């Protein structure tokens, strides 16, 4: 089994457990160049989203693939979710290790007011 398949299996397993709880989830996806975050409700509708592809986020950054970019995305997605009335979420790391950019995004979202 290759690295990507292992990550996807971990992601599916964790996602099913979160769906059983029936709570909003903060989903993270990362590529070498960008990082994406979405808050999704139990009915699979996107409540809030932010990524380094967006102009509002990108213009504040020097690079889009580092920890500082992840912190900015975490802050933006948390602010947008709170505007929509979502404060409690489950963190769905999509099978990625809780380290580096994924951890930075989570910490920034917590500091901005999301609870998980």
Swiss-Prot record:
Domain of life where this protein originates: Bacteria
GO molecular function: 5S rRNA binding; structural constituent of ribosome
InterPro entries per the UniProt record, alphabetical: Ribosomal_uL18_bac-type, Ribosomal_uL18_bac/euk
Keywords tagged on the record: Ribonucleoprotein, Ribosomal protein, RNA-binding, rRNA-binding
Cellular component GO terms held in the UniProt record: cytosolic large ribosomal subunit
Cited Pfam families: Ribosomal_L18p
UniProt KW Metal-binding keyword: no
Any one of the GO BP annotations: translation
Function noted in UniProt: This is one of the proteins that bind and probably mediate the attachment of the 5S RNA into the large ribosomal subunit, where it forms part of the central protuberance.
Protein family membership: Belongs to the universal ribosomal protein uL18 family.
PANTHER family: 39S RIBOSOMAL PROTEIN L18, MITOCHONDRIAL (PTHR12899), LARGE RIBOSOMAL SUBUNIT PROTEIN UL18M (PTHR12899:SF3)
Subunit text: Part of the 50S ribosomal subunit; part of the 5S rRNA/L5/L18/L25 subcomplex. Contacts the 5S and 23S rRNAs.
Protein name as catalogued: Large ribosomal subunit protein uL18
UniProt organism field: Shewanella oneidensis (strain ATCC 700550 / JCM 31522 / CIP 106686 / LMG 19005 / NCIMB 14063 / MR-1)
């Amino acid at each position: 089994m290759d690295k990507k398949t292992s990550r996807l299996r971990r992601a599916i397993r964790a996602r099913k457990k979160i769906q059983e709880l029936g709570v909003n989830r903060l989903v993270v996806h990362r590529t070498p160049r960008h990082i994406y975050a979405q808050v999704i409700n139990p009915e699979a509708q996107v409540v809030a989203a932010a990524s380094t592809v967006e102009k509002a986020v990108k213009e504040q950054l020097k690079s889009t693939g580092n920890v500082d970019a992840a912190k900015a995305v975490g802050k933006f997605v948390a602010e947008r979710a709170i505007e929509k009335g979502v404060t409690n979420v489950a963190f769905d790391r999509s099978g990625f290790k809780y380290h580096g950019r994924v951890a930075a995004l989570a910490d920034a979202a917590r500091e901005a007011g999301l609870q998980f």
